[in-house]
Structures are given as structure tokens and as C-alpha cells.
Regions:
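Bacterial N-terminal signal peptides that target proteins for export
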Residues: 1-8
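An exposed, glycine/acidic-rich loop-and-rim segment of catalytic or binding clefts
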Residues: 21-68, 74-390
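C-terminal motif of bacterial Sec signal peptides marking the signal peptidase cleavage site
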Residues: 16-19
Length: 390
């Protein structure tokens, strides 16, 4: 099927109504307009058209019958924008991101909205042993490897195929030895925007050599919209009675501990900021929440609920469903106001959060954790969903 690229101008409302229409041939200059305190951003397709490592990037849009929209670029297999209706039926862009590929390339935080691999989260000291062979990865997070190394999947151009107005497919061949991971790994990520306001993410991979992998999406959310302030009054519920505590470098200790009577207990809906400043060693290590939750599930359950988040101003609810055993809850602790988002606001401290479905961090070195090993002949398949309501 011929690749379909989004070639018009997309008008995004950060805190209000948005519309999208094709306007080929018009100026590609970006500008903003403000009407009744609503900032409208013109996201220009030309700003996402670039050649990187000999491959072309573009902008792609998905729509549903409710006027919801999900906009992607194949640079990093990345979610750029996600428009959902709030309690007043106005459209809100709940994903923070940038207005050009160059902005993503130059960001001090490279993971906004990206597909993460080959191994999401951290591997201690960038080392692991597989089939008796020792591997040393590039360490890009202090002494550890984070999100695949120096050049993870967020920095590559994926092959894009827009199946229809609801679905887009991204493909990438991660070659044997890339970032020192073994095996030629064929990866397919399919994003679908359903008429139930679900953004479904289906991951599939196969390898010709035994390897490890842990795929996820790293969207940064603010359910009140970009520029609406911090996310500390967002209400969070996580369906997990346990979590994996970490050391000072955010590597799991190997223990699995109960969340009860700790600031990590979100088994009932609680504001993110309610206990984030508590005197707790784990919060000190993460500078807030940056921890993996061990999700409550049974073997009989295929897709199960991992979390629910509600925007205090918008009334938008995001329910997270997954087949994965873990969920990384990140409260935007390392956002440093060094980047400007597509609506003009900066990435200020804790103005977005992440809910990353995953296997546990450092699994290749933790025999007590669910395995992340993939062998030739096996097919890696997993799905997660962000479902929105108001």
C-alpha cells in the first residue's frame, strides 16, 4: 500500500477546539492565534519533512468519528499530538511535544512520544550475559544504559504505512550489533485510533539470534493540555499492590515490595502531588515518582487495566490497559524548562507525566523478574491501550 503522508496544516487546540483540513500550497510558516484564551497552533507538515540517515520523515494523522485525532511522525515512530474531548466537549491536546522534527532532534529530552527500544528503561552498567556470552552496551545514563543506548529507536526513521484513517504501521529493522545488542530484530508497531477514543498500540518482533527486548511508548501527557500548569493535581489510580524499589542510580534492587503504607500506594485514586514531597528514600532517588509497578494480573487475563488518570481541570480520564507485567510511572521530575513545546510553553518541572507499559527494568540481570529474552523462531507480541473518556 502506498504510504500516505499528512500534507496539510493541522490546527491543534491546546486547550480548546481543533480542526484539521488539507491546505496544500499554502505557506508553511508556523504561527499561533489566541481566541477566548484558547491557543491554536498550526502544525505544519513541511516542518516534519526531513532526510535523516538517507530516509525521509513525514507527518501522519489518524481520526475517528468523535473528531479525536492522533498525529505521528516516523522519526522515532513518535506520537506528536493527541486530541481528545474534555468535559465541555472541547478538544484538548493531551500529549506534549514539538512542532518540527528538528525540535525533536535538538530536545534535551529525546524521548517525547517515541517508540522505545531495543530495551526500554535501564540495564545496570550496560551489561548482561546471554547464552554464556557477555554483552557491553553503550552507557548513556550515568553508569547505566537507558532506553536502548546512545541511539535508541527514538532517533531512527521508521518505515511508515498508513493502513486507513484509523491505523498506521511503523516498521524498523534493528541490525545485529546495533548498540551492541545481538540479532537482527524486525520490529512492527501498529497504532490504531478507535471510535471508542482508544489509542491502541500493538507491538510485534522477531529475531535471528537470541536477544533481549522491552518495547514501549514514551508519550508525555498532561490531561489538562499543554501550558495548563503542573500535573500534581491529576488523580492517579494504579492497579498494583507491589513495586520494584531501586538504588540511587534507579536500578531495581531485585526486591519486590508492597506499596501499602508508602507514598507509592495508588491503589485508591490519589493526587500525584499528595505525597510526592514525603521524606522517603525512594522518592529521593527518583526525585519523585520514576518507578516500576508490578501490576495485579492473573494468567487467565489477557488485556487488563493497569492505571487510570484524571485531569483535574479538563475532566479527561485516561485508562491504561496492557498485556505487560509492569508499568513505569514517571512524574516529570527531570523536566528542566530547556525545551519549548508546540504551543509555546516550556517543559517546566512536572508539567507532564508518563505511564509506560513494560517488562521490569534491568530484567536481563534479574533472574526473579519476568524474562525479556526472545529466541529465533519466537514471535514477540504485546498490546497496550490508552482509553479516553470525560
Amino acid at each position: 500500500m502506498k504510504i500516505k503522508s499528512f500534507t496539510g496544516l493541522c490546527f491543534l487546540a491546546i486547550l480548546g477546539l481543533a480542526s484539521c483540513q488539507s491546505e496544500s500550497g499554502k505557506s508553511s510558516k508556523e504561527n499561533t492565534q489566541t481566541t477566548d484564551s484558547i491557543t491554536v497552533v498550526k502544525l505544519v507538515a513541511d516542518s516534519f519533512q526531513k532526510e535523516i540517515d538517507g530516509k525521509s520523515t513525514g507527518l501522519y494523522t489518524l481520526k475517528n468519528k468523535n473528531q479525536a485525532e492522533a498525529i505521528f511522525t516516523n522519526y522515532g515512530g513518535r506520537l506528536v499530538s493527541l486530541l481528545m474531548p474534555d468535559k465541555d466537549k472541547k478538544m484538548v491536546d493531551v500529549v506534549v511535544g514539538f512542532k518540527s522534527v528538528s525540535d525533536y532532534q535538538n530536545s534535551t529530552e529525546p524521548y517525547f512520544g517515541a517508540t522505545i527500544g531495543r530495551f526500554g528503561n535501564r540495564i545496570a552498567k550496560g551489561k548482561f550475559t546471554l547464552d554464556g556470552k557477555k554483552y557491553q552496551l553503550f552507557t548513556n545514563n550515568g553508569q547505566n544504559t537507558l532506553h536502548g543506548g546512545k541511539k535508541g529507536y527514538q532517533d531512527v526513521v521508521w518505515d511508515a504505512k498508513q493502513i486507513n484513517e484509523h491505523t498506521i504501521q511503523f516498521d524498523y529493522l534493528s541490525k545485529d550489533g546495533e548498540e551492541n545488542f545481538p540479532g537482527n530484530l524486525k520490529v512492527t508497531v501498529t497504532y490504531t485510533l478507535t471510535d471508542d477514543n482508544e489509542l491502541k498500540m500493538d507491538y510485534q518482533a522477531s529475531t535471528d539470534k537470541t536477544t533481549v527486548l522491552n518495547l514501549t511508548n514514551h508519550a508525555f501527557f498532561n490531561l489538562n493540555g499543554e501550558g495548563s500548569g503542573d500535573i500534581l493535581n491529576h488523580e492517579v489510580e494504579i492497579f498494583a499492590d507491589e513495586y520494584t524499589p531501586v538504588d540511587s542510580t534507579l536500578i531495581p534492587t531485585g526486591k519486590i515490595e508492597k506499596v501499602k503504607n508508602t507514598p507509592f500506594d495508588f491503589t485508591t485514586a490519589t493526587n500525584i502531588g499528595a505525597r510526592i514531597k514525603d521524606n522517603n528514600e525512594q522518592l529521593t532517588f527518583g526525585k519523585g515518582y520514576d518507578h516500576n509497578y508490578v501490576l495485579n494480573k492473573t494468567k487467565a487475563m489477557n488485556m487488563f487495566q493497569a492505571a487510570s488518570v484524571k485531569g483535574d481541570k479538563s475532566g479527561i480520564v485516561m485508562d491504561v490497559y496492557t498485556q505487560e507485567p509492569g508499568l513505569q510511572f514517571y512524574s516529570g521530575n527531570f523536566m528542566q524548562s530547556k525545551n519549548k513545546f508546540k504551543g509555546g510553553s516550556k517543559d517546566d518541572f512536572r508539567t507532564a507525566f508518563c505511564m509506560e507499559t513494560q517488562h521490569f527494568p534491568d530484567s536481563p540481570n534479574q533472574p526473579g523478574f519476568p524474562s525479556t529474552v526472545l529466541k529465533p523462531g519466537q514471535v514477540y507480541k504485546t498490546s497496550s491501550i490508552y482509553k479516553f473518556s470525560n
